[in-house]
Swiss-Prot record:
Function summary: Nucleotidase that shows phosphatase activity on nucleoside 5'-monophosphates.
Name of the featured protein: 5'-nucleotidase SurE
Primary site of residence: cytoplasm
Signal sequence annotation: none
Protein's organism: Nitrosomonas eutropha (strain DSM 101675 / C91 / Nm57)
Catalysed reaction, written as an equation: a ribonucleoside 5'-phosphate + H2O = a ribonucleoside + phosphate
Length: 247
């Protein structure tokens, strides 16, 4: 079993270290991650300069690019054999609902999926940052299940884990994405030198956290697993737009 690990928090992040440690007991693990925190990078590729690949003292590889760059480079230009699975994370923070559009964690897994590989994005909905081992054990459980019962087709899963000890989890729920309210406005700030700068505002609170959503599962201390797709087409609006053009 060969697993490629990546993330958007950077190769030095505790989440990916926890994941590499626990998965190394059952698989040949290669870590290729960004050299710095690239949270919010989404599915961006670096096209304006070449990428470089380096190996750190802990054996992890790092790239001067985005999470998507890391997976693309590893699968298409670095690894001698294709991985059996791509896993991205463990992200420090939730990737639920609208977060998935912005998330570099989800993007790294998405790139694996686009390259024809089963892929999982995993995030710890963290407050204490003390339960990365919980999320790592959930991933280990999923990988063991995959080894025993492989997917018939490549699949893309988004996993969110409550920030709790493993024994306090209330199970696993297969969910759909919820929705957030719009994000908070940017924060305007004056530097000591008189320059006006802006910080991106916080994500909006949950708008749709109804039963069956990832938000609802996490509110009830359950792990959320959401199968994702790439097709963004609103099929129910195709006829509406056609009629709008005729008018």
């Amino acid at each position: 079993m060969r697993i490629l690990l990546s993330n958007d928090d950077g190769y030095f992040a505790p989440g990916i270290a926890n994941l590499a440690k626990i998965l190394s007991d059952i698989a040949d693990v290669t870590v290729v991650a960004p050299e710095r925190d690239r949270s919010g990078a989404s599915n961006s590729l670096t096209l304006d300069r070449p990428l470089s690949l380096h190996k750190s003292h802990n054996g992890f590889y790092y790239v001067n690019g985005t999470p998507t760059d890391c997976v693309h480079l590893a699968v298409t230009g670095m690894l001698d054999e294709l991985p059996d699975m791509v896993i991205s994370g463990i992200n420090d923070g939730a990737n639920m609902g609208d977060d998935t559009v912005y998330s570099g964690t989800v993007a790294a897994a998405t790139e694996g999926f686009l390259l024809g590989l089963p892929s999982i994005a995993v995030s710890l909905v963290s407050m204490s940052r003390g339960n990365f081992p919980t999320a790592a054990k959930i991933v280990l459980d999923l990988v063991k299940r995959f080894i025993d019962n492989k997917f018939h087709v490549p699949i893309l899963l988004n996993v969110n884990v409550p920030d709790l000890p493993y024994e306090e989890l209330q199970g696993i729920e297969v969910t759909r994405l919820g929705r957030r309210h719009k994000a908070e406005p940017v924060i305007k700030y004056q530097t000591p030198r008189g320059e006006t700068v802006y910080w991106v505002g916080a994500a909006g609170a949950a708008q749709d956290a109804s039963e069956g959503t990832d938000f609802h599962a996490l509110q009830n201390n359950r792990v959320s697993i959401t199968p994702l797709q790439i097709d963004l087409t609103r099929y129910d609006q195709i006829g509406y737009v056609k009629n709008w053009l005729v008018f």
